[in-house]
Protein backbone atom coordinates (compact mmCIF):
# COMPACT_ATOMS: atom_id res chain seq x y z
CA UNK A 1 0.00 0.00 0.00
CA UNK A 2 2.82 2.36 0.91
CA UNK A 3 4.48 1.69 -2.48
CA UNK A 4 1.25 2.40 -4.32
CA UNK A 5 0.85 5.76 -2.54
CA UNK A 6 4.42 6.71 -3.35
CA UNK A 7 3.94 5.79 -7.01
CA UNK A 8 0.68 7.75 -7.14
CA UNK A 9 2.35 10.80 -5.62
CA UNK A 10 5.22 10.57 -8.11
CA UNK A 11 2.84 10.39 -11.07
CA UNK A 12 0.85 13.38 -9.83
CA UNK A 13 3.99 15.46 -9.33
CA UNK A 14 5.22 14.46 -12.78
CA UNK A 15 1.95 15.50 -14.39
CA UNK A 16 2.01 18.84 -12.56
CA UNK A 17 5.60 19.44 -13.65
CA UNK A 18 4.95 18.59 -17.30
CA UNK A 19 1.64 20.45 -17.53
CA UNK A 20 1.38 23.63 -19.54
CA UNK A 21 2.08 26.78 -17.53
CA UNK A 22 -1.03 28.02 -15.67
CA UNK A 23 -2.43 31.30 -17.00
CA UNK A 24 -4.64 33.02 -14.46
CA UNK A 25 -8.04 34.03 -15.75
CA UNK A 26 -8.49 37.77 -15.47
CA UNK A 27 -11.50 39.05 -13.52
CA UNK A 28 -13.13 40.47 -16.66
CA UNK A 29 -12.59 37.18 -18.51
CA UNK A 30 -14.06 35.22 -15.62
CA UNK A 31 -17.11 37.49 -15.54
CA UNK A 32 -17.58 36.98 -19.28
CA UNK A 33 -17.36 33.19 -18.95
CA UNK A 34 -19.41 33.04 -15.74
CA UNK A 35 -21.70 36.11 -15.75
CA UNK A 36 -23.29 36.83 -12.38
CA UNK A 37 -26.89 35.76 -11.97
CA UNK A 38 -29.74 38.27 -11.97
CA UNK A 39 -30.06 37.57 -8.25
CA UNK A 40 -26.50 38.78 -7.72
CA UNK A 41 -26.68 41.71 -10.15
CA UNK A 42 -29.74 43.07 -8.33
CA UNK A 43 -27.94 42.56 -5.00
CA UNK A 44 -30.86 40.43 -3.80
CA UNK A 45 -28.49 38.64 -1.44
CA UNK A 46 -27.49 41.96 0.13
CA UNK A 47 -29.19 42.62 3.52
CA UNK A 48 -29.14 46.36 2.76
CA UNK A 49 -31.38 45.72 -0.26
CA UNK A 50 -33.93 43.91 1.88
CA UNK A 51 -33.84 46.44 4.69
CA UNK A 52 -34.31 49.47 2.43
CA UNK A 53 -36.54 47.79 -0.16
CA UNK A 54 -38.86 46.22 2.41
CA UNK A 55 -39.27 49.50 4.26
CA UNK A 56 -40.11 51.46 1.11
CA UNK A 57 -42.52 48.71 -0.03
CA UNK A 58 -44.28 48.78 3.34
CA UNK A 59 -44.57 52.57 3.14
CA UNK A 60 -46.19 52.40 -0.31
CA UNK A 61 -48.50 49.58 0.80
CA UNK A 62 -49.71 51.60 3.77
CA UNK A 63 -50.11 54.70 1.59
CA UNK A 64 -52.32 52.80 -0.84
CA UNK A 65 -54.39 50.90 1.74
CA UNK A 66 -54.56 53.05 4.87
CA UNK A 67 -53.55 56.61 4.16
CA UNK A 68 -55.02 58.01 7.36
CA UNK A 69 -53.00 55.69 9.59
CA UNK A 70 -49.82 56.37 7.61
CA UNK A 71 -50.36 60.13 7.79
CA UNK A 72 -50.97 59.94 11.54
CA UNK A 73 -47.80 57.90 12.09
CA UNK A 74 -45.69 60.19 9.90
CA UNK A 75 -47.05 63.32 11.57
CA UNK A 76 -46.32 61.87 15.01
CA UNK A 77 -42.79 60.91 13.95
CA UNK A 78 -42.29 64.31 12.32
CA UNK A 79 -43.37 66.11 15.48
CA UNK A 80 -41.09 63.95 17.64
CA UNK A 81 -38.09 64.49 15.34
CA UNK A 82 -38.45 68.26 15.10
CA UNK A 83 -39.19 68.70 18.83
CA UNK A 84 -36.39 66.60 20.27
CA UNK A 85 -33.73 66.77 17.55
CA UNK A 86 -34.26 70.22 16.02
CA UNK A 87 -31.80 72.01 18.30
CA UNK A 88 -29.23 69.25 17.79
CA UNK A 89 -29.55 69.59 14.02
CA UNK A 90 -29.10 73.37 14.21
CA UNK A 91 -25.88 73.00 16.20
CA UNK A 92 -24.72 70.13 13.96
CA UNK A 93 -25.05 72.20 10.77
CA UNK A 94 -23.41 75.25 12.31
CA UNK A 95 -20.40 73.28 13.61
CA UNK A 96 -20.07 71.46 10.29
CA UNK A 97 -19.86 74.79 8.45
CA UNK A 98 -17.45 76.49 10.87
CA UNK A 99 -15.07 73.52 11.12
CA UNK A 100 -15.08 73.25 7.33
CA UNK A 101 -14.03 76.89 7.00
CA UNK A 102 -11.25 76.38 9.54
CA UNK A 103 -9.89 73.46 7.52
CA UNK A 104 -10.18 75.40 4.27
CA UNK A 105 -8.20 78.42 5.49
CA UNK A 106 -5.60 76.49 7.47
CA UNK A 107 -2.65 74.50 6.13
CA UNK A 108 -5.02 71.60 5.61
CA UNK A 109 -6.62 73.62 2.81
CA UNK A 110 -3.76 72.59 0.53
CA UNK A 111 -4.38 68.86 1.03
CA UNK A 112 -5.23 67.19 -2.27
CA UNK A 113 -7.99 64.59 -2.07
CA UNK A 114 -8.54 61.30 -3.83
CA UNK A 115 -4.96 60.37 -4.67
CA UNK A 116 -4.82 62.40 -7.89
CA UNK A 117 -2.47 65.30 -8.65
CA UNK A 118 -5.19 67.25 -10.48
CA UNK A 119 -8.99 67.03 -10.83
CA UNK A 120 -10.36 64.42 -13.22
CA UNK A 121 -13.40 66.63 -14.03
CA UNK A 122 -12.93 70.25 -15.09
CA UNK A 123 -14.26 72.93 -12.76
CA UNK A 124 -17.24 74.11 -14.84
CA UNK A 125 -18.56 70.58 -15.35
CA UNK A 126 -17.90 69.71 -11.72
CA UNK A 127 -19.68 72.77 -10.33
CA UNK A 128 -22.56 72.27 -12.79
CA UNK A 129 -23.09 68.72 -11.54
CA UNK A 130 -22.91 69.82 -7.91
CA UNK A 131 -25.34 72.73 -8.35
CA UNK A 132 -27.91 70.81 -10.36
CA UNK A 133 -27.84 67.71 -8.17
CA UNK A 134 -28.21 69.51 -4.86
CA UNK A 135 -30.79 72.08 -5.96
CA UNK A 136 -33.19 69.54 -7.51
CA UNK A 137 -36.72 70.79 -8.20
CA UNK A 138 -36.46 73.17 -5.27
CA UNK A 139 -34.24 75.29 -7.44
CA UNK A 140 -37.28 76.49 -9.37
CA UNK A 141 -40.52 76.13 -7.41
CA UNK A 142 -39.09 76.96 -3.97
CA UNK A 143 -37.08 79.82 -5.47
CA UNK A 144 -40.37 81.31 -6.63
CA UNK A 145 -42.54 80.50 -3.62
CA UNK A 146 -40.45 80.71 -0.45
CA UNK A 147 -39.69 84.46 -0.62
CA UNK A 148 -43.38 85.31 -1.07
CA UNK A 149 -44.26 82.91 1.76
CA UNK A 150 -41.98 84.81 4.16
CA UNK A 151 -43.30 88.11 2.80
CA UNK A 152 -46.92 87.14 3.48
CA UNK A 153 -46.12 85.72 6.94
CA UNK A 154 -43.02 87.36 8.39
CA UNK A 155 -40.39 85.10 10.01
CA UNK A 156 -40.60 85.53 13.80
CA UNK A 157 -36.99 86.68 14.11
CA UNK A 158 -37.76 89.70 11.92
CA UNK A 159 -41.42 90.40 12.69
CA UNK A 160 -43.63 92.86 10.85
CA UNK A 161 -42.01 95.72 8.94
CA UNK A 162 -42.61 98.03 5.97
CA UNK A 163 -43.32 96.26 2.65
CA UNK A 164 -39.83 96.95 1.23
CA UNK A 165 -38.09 95.86 4.43
CA UNK A 166 -40.31 92.78 4.65
CA UNK A 167 -39.31 91.84 1.11
CA UNK A 168 -35.59 91.99 1.99
CA UNK A 169 -36.25 90.05 5.19
CA UNK A 170 -38.08 87.41 3.17
CA UNK A 171 -35.13 87.02 0.82
CA UNK A 172 -32.73 86.89 3.76
CA UNK A 173 -34.68 84.06 5.43
CA UNK A 174 -34.85 82.14 2.14
CA UNK A 175 -31.11 82.59 1.69
CA UNK A 176 -30.57 81.12 5.15
CA UNK A 177 -32.54 77.98 4.32
CA UNK A 178 -30.76 77.42 0.99
CA UNK A 179 -27.41 78.93 1.92
CA UNK A 180 -24.15 78.17 3.66
CA UNK A 181 -25.31 75.69 6.32
CA UNK A 182 -27.51 73.67 3.99
CA UNK A 183 -24.86 73.27 1.33
CA UNK A 184 -22.06 72.51 3.78
CA UNK A 185 -23.84 69.50 5.32
CA UNK A 186 -24.27 67.99 1.86
CA UNK A 187 -20.67 67.25 1.15
CA UNK A 188 -17.80 68.97 2.95
CA UNK A 189 -16.48 67.26 6.09
CA UNK A 190 -18.22 63.99 5.27
CA UNK A 191 -16.75 63.97 1.75
CA UNK A 192 -13.25 64.62 3.14
CA UNK A 193 -13.58 61.65 5.51
CA UNK A 194 -14.98 59.41 2.78
CA UNK A 195 -12.34 60.34 0.22
CA UNK A 196 -9.53 59.63 2.68
CA UNK A 197 -10.93 56.31 3.90
CA UNK A 198 -11.91 55.14 0.41
CA UNK A 199 -9.11 56.32 -1.87
CA UNK A 200 -6.26 56.22 0.66
CA UNK A 201 -7.30 53.33 2.91
CA UNK A 202 -9.34 51.18 0.52
CA UNK A 203 -12.60 51.17 2.51
CA UNK A 204 -15.90 50.97 0.58
CA UNK A 205 -17.58 54.10 -0.78
CA UNK A 206 -20.63 53.62 1.42
CA UNK A 207 -22.33 55.49 4.30
CA UNK A 208 -21.06 52.86 6.75
CA UNK A 209 -17.53 54.11 6.13
CA UNK A 210 -18.45 57.39 7.86
CA UNK A 211 -18.81 55.35 11.07
CA UNK A 212 -15.42 53.67 10.72
CA UNK A 213 -13.53 56.30 12.78
CA UNK A 214 -15.77 55.39 15.76
CA UNK A 215 -16.64 51.69 15.36
CA UNK A 216 -13.74 50.41 13.27
CA UNK A 217 -14.26 47.13 11.40
CA UNK A 218 -17.66 46.61 13.06
CA UNK A 219 -18.98 49.46 10.93
CA UNK A 220 -17.68 47.88 7.73
CA UNK A 221 -18.61 44.24 8.29
CA UNK A 222 -21.32 44.23 10.95
CA UNK A 223 -25.00 45.01 11.35
CA UNK A 224 -24.15 48.64 12.22
CA UNK A 225 -22.90 49.17 8.67
CA UNK A 226 -25.93 47.48 7.10
CA UNK A 227 -28.24 49.69 9.16
CA UNK A 228 -26.30 52.86 8.26
CA UNK A 229 -26.44 52.04 4.54
CA UNK A 230 -30.15 51.16 4.67
CA UNK A 231 -31.12 54.33 6.59
CA UNK A 232 -29.17 56.48 4.13
CA UNK A 233 -30.75 54.79 1.11
CA UNK A 234 -34.26 55.10 2.57
CA UNK A 235 -33.69 58.78 3.32
CA UNK A 236 -32.34 59.69 -0.10
CA UNK A 237 -34.91 57.53 -1.91
CA UNK A 238 -37.69 59.33 -0.03
CA UNK A 239 -36.03 62.65 -0.81
CA UNK A 240 -35.83 61.77 -4.51
CA UNK A 241 -39.20 60.05 -4.94
CA UNK A 242 -40.94 63.04 -3.35
CA UNK A 243 -39.67 65.62 -5.88
CA UNK A 244 -40.33 63.18 -8.74
CA UNK A 245 -43.95 62.85 -7.60
CA UNK A 246 -44.34 66.58 -7.08
CA UNK A 247 -42.87 67.13 -10.54
CA UNK A 248 -45.80 65.17 -11.97
CA UNK A 249 -48.33 67.11 -9.90
CA UNK A 250 -46.82 70.53 -10.57
CA UNK A 251 -46.07 70.13 -14.29
CA UNK A 252 -49.57 68.73 -14.80
CA UNK A 253 -51.03 71.80 -13.06
CA UNK A 254 -48.89 74.10 -15.20
CA UNK A 255 -49.81 72.33 -18.45
CA UNK A 256 -53.46 72.71 -17.53
CA UNK A 257 -53.04 76.42 -16.80
CA UNK A 258 -51.01 77.12 -19.95
CA UNK A 259 -52.48 74.78 -22.55
CA UNK A 260 -55.66 73.31 -21.08
CA UNK A 261 -54.31 69.77 -20.73
CA UNK A 262 -56.37 67.81 -18.21
CA UNK A 263 -54.81 67.98 -14.77
CA UNK A 264 -55.32 64.34 -13.88
CA UNK A 265 -53.50 61.13 -13.00
CA UNK A 266 -52.79 60.26 -16.65
CA UNK A 267 -51.03 63.56 -17.35
CA UNK A 268 -49.14 63.36 -14.07
CA UNK A 269 -48.02 59.80 -14.83
CA UNK A 270 -46.87 60.71 -18.34
CA UNK A 271 -44.70 63.50 -16.93
CA UNK A 272 -43.14 61.11 -14.41
CA UNK A 273 -42.57 58.39 -17.03
CA UNK A 274 -40.74 60.92 -19.22
CA UNK A 275 -38.58 61.89 -16.24
CA UNK A 276 -37.90 58.21 -15.42
CA UNK A 277 -36.69 57.53 -18.95
CA UNK A 278 -34.41 60.58 -18.97
CA UNK A 279 -32.76 60.14 -15.58
CA UNK A 280 -32.40 56.36 -15.92
CA UNK A 281 -30.70 56.67 -19.31
CA UNK A 282 -28.49 59.41 -17.90
CA UNK A 283 -27.55 57.24 -14.89
CA UNK A 284 -26.78 54.29 -17.19
CA UNK A 285 -24.32 56.40 -19.19
CA UNK A 286 -22.42 57.31 -16.01
CA UNK A 287 -20.89 60.40 -14.45
CA UNK A 288 -18.61 61.22 -17.38
CA UNK A 289 -21.38 61.22 -19.98
CA UNK A 290 -25.09 61.59 -19.24
CA UNK A 291 -24.89 63.17 -15.79
CA UNK A 292 -22.35 65.75 -16.99
CA UNK A 293 -24.30 66.44 -20.18
CA UNK A 294 -27.66 67.03 -18.50
CA UNK A 295 -26.06 69.21 -15.82
CA UNK A 296 -24.23 71.31 -18.40
CA UNK A 297 -27.37 72.00 -20.45
CA UNK A 298 -29.26 72.70 -17.24
CA UNK A 299 -26.77 75.38 -16.23
CA UNK A 300 -26.79 76.90 -19.74
CA UNK A 301 -30.60 77.19 -19.69
CA UNK A 302 -30.46 78.68 -16.18
CA UNK A 303 -27.92 81.31 -17.28
CA UNK A 304 -30.06 82.24 -20.30
CA UNK A 305 -33.12 82.69 -18.09
CA UNK A 306 -31.10 84.74 -15.60
CA UNK A 307 -29.94 87.03 -18.40
CA UNK A 308 -33.47 87.36 -19.78
CA UNK A 309 -35.03 88.24 -16.43
CA UNK A 310 -32.23 90.66 -15.56
CA UNK A 311 -32.77 92.46 -18.86
CA UNK A 312 -36.58 92.44 -19.02
CA UNK A 313 -37.48 92.08 -15.34
CA UNK A 314 -37.17 94.29 -12.23
CA UNK A 315 -33.38 94.53 -12.53
CA UNK A 316 -32.79 97.15 -9.84
CA UNK A 317 -34.81 95.29 -7.21
CA UNK A 318 -33.14 91.97 -8.06
CA UNK A 319 -29.64 93.36 -7.57
CA UNK A 320 -30.53 95.43 -4.49
CA UNK A 321 -32.46 92.51 -3.02
CA UNK A 322 -29.54 90.15 -3.51
CA UNK A 323 -26.95 92.48 -1.97
CA UNK A 324 -29.15 93.54 0.95
CA UNK A 325 -30.54 90.04 1.48
CA UNK A 326 -27.10 88.44 1.67
CA UNK A 327 -25.88 91.28 3.90
CA UNK A 328 -28.83 90.87 6.26
CA UNK A 329 -28.35 87.10 6.35
CA UNK A 330 -24.66 87.50 7.25
CA UNK A 331 -25.48 90.19 9.82
CA UNK A 332 -28.05 87.93 11.50
CA UNK A 333 -26.25 84.68 10.74
CA UNK A 334 -25.83 83.31 14.26
CA UNK A 335 -29.23 84.47 15.57
CA UNK A 336 -30.92 82.85 12.55
CA UNK A 337 -28.85 79.67 12.78
CA UNK A 338 -29.59 79.17 16.48
CA UNK A 339 -33.10 80.68 16.73
CA UNK A 340 -35.31 78.56 19.05
CA UNK A 341 -38.18 80.80 20.22
CA UNK A 342 -41.07 79.86 17.91
CA UNK A 343 -40.71 76.07 17.69
CA UNK A 344 -43.92 75.73 15.70
CA UNK A 345 -42.57 77.96 12.94
CA UNK A 346 -39.16 76.28 13.14
CA UNK A 347 -40.61 72.79 12.65
CA UNK A 348 -42.16 73.77 9.33
CA UNK A 349 -39.31 75.90 8.09
CA UNK A 350 -35.71 75.86 9.35
CA UNK A 351 -35.77 72.50 11.13
CA UNK A 352 -37.77 70.95 8.28
CA UNK A 353 -35.13 72.05 5.76
CA UNK A 354 -32.28 70.95 8.05
CA UNK A 355 -33.85 67.50 8.40
CA UNK A 356 -34.30 67.35 4.63
CA UNK A 357 -30.68 68.22 3.88
CA UNK A 358 -29.34 65.93 6.61
CA UNK A 359 -31.32 63.06 5.06
CA UNK A 360 -29.46 63.62 1.80
CA UNK A 361 -26.11 64.05 3.57
CA UNK A 362 -24.34 60.66 3.40
CA UNK A 363 -25.40 59.84 -0.16
CA UNK A 364 -24.52 63.30 -1.42
CA UNK A 365 -21.14 62.99 0.30
CA UNK A 366 -20.57 59.74 -1.61
CA UNK A 367 -21.53 61.37 -4.90
CA UNK A 368 -19.29 64.39 -4.27
CA UNK A 369 -16.43 62.10 -3.22
CA UNK A 370 -16.88 60.23 -6.50
CA UNK A 371 -16.64 63.37 -8.68
CA UNK A 372 -14.11 65.44 -6.69
CA UNK A 373 -10.86 63.48 -6.92
CA UNK A 374 -7.80 65.70 -7.33
CA UNK A 375 -9.34 68.77 -5.68
CA UNK A 376 -7.93 70.36 -2.56
CA UNK A 377 -9.83 70.67 0.70
CA UNK A 378 -9.94 74.44 0.15
CA UNK A 379 -11.41 74.07 -3.34
CA UNK A 380 -13.99 71.57 -2.11
CA UNK A 381 -15.16 73.53 0.91
CA UNK A 382 -15.13 77.02 -0.61
CA UNK A 383 -16.93 75.80 -3.74
CA UNK A 384 -19.65 73.89 -1.89
CA UNK A 385 -19.98 75.93 1.32
CA UNK A 386 -19.51 79.46 -0.11
CA UNK A 387 -19.66 79.73 -3.92
CA UNK A 388 -22.59 77.38 -4.52
CA UNK A 389 -24.76 79.01 -1.80
CA UNK A 390 -24.06 82.50 -3.14
CA UNK A 391 -25.01 81.35 -6.65
CA UNK A 392 -28.16 79.78 -5.22
CA UNK A 393 -29.05 83.00 -3.40
CA UNK A 394 -28.65 84.96 -6.63
CA UNK A 395 -30.95 82.50 -8.40
CA UNK A 396 -33.53 82.98 -5.62
CA UNK A 397 -33.18 86.75 -6.12
CA UNK A 398 -33.81 86.34 -9.85
CA UNK A 399 -36.96 84.23 -9.49
CA UNK A 400 -38.33 84.99 -6.03
CA UNK A 401 -37.01 88.55 -6.03
CA UNK A 402 -38.92 89.25 -9.24
CA UNK A 403 -42.05 87.92 -7.57
CA UNK A 404 -41.55 90.24 -4.61
CA UNK A 405 -40.99 93.22 -6.91
CA UNK A 406 -44.20 92.45 -8.81
CA UNK A 407 -46.05 92.04 -5.49
CA UNK A 408 -44.78 95.40 -4.20
CA UNK A 409 -45.84 97.10 -7.44
CA UNK A 410 -49.24 95.39 -7.53
CA UNK A 411 -50.23 94.02 -4.09
CA UNK A 412 -52.01 90.68 -4.28
CA UNK A 413 -50.68 89.76 -7.73
CA UNK A 414 -48.29 87.06 -6.47
CA UNK A 415 -49.61 86.48 -2.94
CA UNK A 416 -53.07 85.54 -4.23
CA UNK A 417 -51.51 82.91 -6.50
CA UNK A 418 -49.65 81.55 -3.47
CA UNK A 419 -52.86 80.88 -1.49
CA UNK A 420 -53.01 77.25 -0.44
CA UNK A 421 -49.22 76.98 -0.75
CA UNK A 422 -49.55 76.61 -4.52
CA UNK A 423 -45.92 76.55 -5.69
CA UNK A 424 -46.46 76.18 -9.47
CA UNK A 425 -49.10 78.94 -9.44
CA UNK A 426 -46.54 81.35 -7.97
CA UNK A 427 -44.03 80.51 -10.69
CA UNK A 428 -46.63 81.02 -13.43
CA UNK A 429 -47.74 84.31 -11.86
CA UNK A 430 -44.13 85.54 -11.99
CA UNK A 431 -43.47 84.43 -15.57
CA UNK A 432 -46.82 85.92 -16.56
CA UNK A 433 -45.45 89.38 -15.82
CA UNK A 434 -42.48 88.99 -18.17
CA UNK A 435 -42.43 89.54 -21.95
CA UNK A 436 -43.37 86.41 -23.93
CA UNK A 437 -44.84 84.75 -20.84
CA UNK A 438 -45.82 81.51 -22.59
CA UNK A 439 -42.30 80.82 -23.88
CA UNK A 440 -40.67 81.73 -20.55
CA UNK A 441 -43.16 79.57 -18.64
CA UNK A 442 -42.40 76.57 -20.85
CA UNK A 443 -38.65 77.11 -20.45
CA UNK A 444 -39.05 77.17 -16.67
CA UNK A 445 -41.02 73.92 -16.80
CA UNK A 446 -38.24 72.36 -18.88
CA UNK A 447 -35.70 73.65 -16.37
CA UNK A 448 -37.68 72.18 -13.48
CA UNK A 449 -37.74 68.82 -15.23
CA UNK A 450 -34.01 68.82 -15.93
CA UNK A 451 -33.28 69.78 -12.32
CA UNK A 452 -35.24 66.72 -11.19
CA UNK A 453 -33.53 64.58 -13.84
CA UNK A 454 -30.07 65.60 -12.59
CA UNK A 455 -31.03 64.66 -9.04
CA UNK A 456 -32.70 61.44 -10.17
CA UNK A 457 -29.73 60.27 -12.24
CA UNK A 458 -27.18 61.19 -9.56
CA UNK A 459 -29.10 59.47 -6.77
CA UNK A 460 -29.87 56.41 -8.92
CA UNK A 461 -26.16 56.13 -9.59
CA UNK A 462 -25.20 56.70 -5.94
CA UNK A 463 -27.69 54.18 -4.53
CA UNK A 464 -26.31 51.65 -7.02
CA UNK A 465 -22.75 52.43 -5.88
CA UNK A 466 -23.73 51.80 -2.26
CA UNK A 467 -25.53 48.57 -3.15
CA UNK A 468 -22.69 47.11 -5.20
CA UNK A 469 -19.65 48.72 -3.61
CA UNK A 470 -18.41 49.52 -7.12
CA UNK A 471 -17.70 52.96 -8.61
CA UNK A 472 -19.23 51.64 -11.85
CA UNK A 473 -22.30 49.62 -10.78
CA UNK A 474 -23.87 47.31 -13.34
CA UNK A 475 -26.64 48.49 -15.64
CA UNK A 476 -29.22 46.11 -14.18
CA UNK A 477 -29.14 47.60 -10.70
CA UNK A 478 -28.99 51.19 -12.02
CA UNK A 479 -32.09 50.51 -14.12
CA UNK A 480 -33.85 48.79 -11.23
CA UNK A 481 -33.45 51.68 -8.79
CA UNK A 482 -34.22 54.31 -11.41
CA UNK A 483 -37.44 52.55 -12.39
CA UNK A 484 -38.34 51.68 -8.81
CA UNK A 485 -38.24 55.29 -7.60
CA UNK A 486 -40.40 56.43 -10.51
CA UNK A 487 -42.93 53.62 -10.06
CA UNK A 488 -43.22 54.39 -6.34
CA UNK A 489 -43.84 58.06 -7.19
CA UNK A 490 -46.62 57.09 -9.62
CA UNK A 491 -48.16 54.75 -7.05
CA UNK A 492 -48.20 57.51 -4.44
CA UNK A 493 -49.71 60.20 -6.69
CA UNK A 494 -52.48 57.78 -7.70
CA UNK A 495 -54.08 58.61 -4.36
CA UNK A 496 -53.58 62.38 -4.69
CA UNK A 497 -50.93 64.54 -3.10
CA UNK A 498 -51.33 62.98 0.36
CA UNK A 499 -48.94 60.09 -0.23
CA UNK A 500 -46.20 62.30 -1.64
CA UNK A 501 -46.66 64.84 1.17
CA UNK A 502 -46.31 62.06 3.74
CA UNK A 503 -43.13 60.89 2.03
CA UNK A 504 -41.74 64.43 2.02
CA UNK A 505 -42.34 64.67 5.77
CA UNK A 506 -40.92 61.20 6.31
CA UNK A 507 -37.45 62.24 5.16
CA UNK A 508 -37.29 64.50 8.23
CA UNK A 509 -37.86 61.41 10.41
CA UNK A 510 -35.05 59.55 8.64
CA UNK A 511 -32.77 62.48 9.46
CA UNK A 512 -32.72 61.32 13.10
CA UNK A 513 -30.52 58.23 12.50
CA UNK A 514 -28.75 59.80 9.52
CA UNK A 515 -27.63 62.78 11.63
CA UNK A 516 -25.72 60.37 13.86
CA UNK A 517 -24.07 58.85 10.78
CA UNK A 518 -22.78 62.33 9.92
CA UNK A 519 -21.67 63.20 13.45
CA UNK A 520 -18.32 61.31 13.37
CA UNK A 521 -17.22 63.40 10.39
CA UNK A 522 -17.49 66.56 12.47
CA UNK A 523 -15.54 64.96 15.31
CA UNK A 524 -12.85 63.26 13.21
CA UNK A 525 -12.43 65.35 10.02
CA UNK A 526 -9.91 67.80 11.56
CA UNK A 527 -7.64 64.96 12.70
CA UNK A 528 -7.93 63.18 9.36
CA UNK A 529 -7.20 66.41 7.45
CA UNK A 530 -4.14 67.09 9.61
CA UNK A 531 -2.86 63.55 9.08
CA UNK A 532 -3.27 63.92 5.31
CA UNK A 533 -1.40 67.24 5.49
CA UNK A 534 1.49 65.47 7.25
CA UNK A 535 1.45 62.61 4.75
CA UNK A 536 1.63 65.11 1.88
CA UNK A 537 4.46 67.07 3.51
CA UNK A 538 2.40 70.20 4.13
CA UNK A 539 3.11 70.47 7.86
From Swiss-Prot:
Keyword Transport found: yes
Annotated keywords: Amino-acid transport, Cell inner membrane, Cell membrane, Membrane, Stress response, Transmembrane, Transmembrane helix, Transport
Coiled coil: none
GO biological process terms held by the UniProt record: amino acid transport
A single MF term (Gene Ontology): transmembrane transporter activity
GO cellular component terms listed in the entry, alphabetical order: plasma membrane
Induction of synthesis: Induced by NaCl upshock.
TM spans (from-to): 44-64, 85-105, 129-149, 175-195, 231-251, 265-285, 299-319, 348-368, 380-400, 426-446, 480-500, 503-523
Role: Involved in the uptake of the osmoprotectant glycine betaine.
Name of this protein: Glycine betaine transporter 2
Source organism (scientific name): Vibrio parahaemolyticus serotype O3:K6 (strain RIMD 2210633)
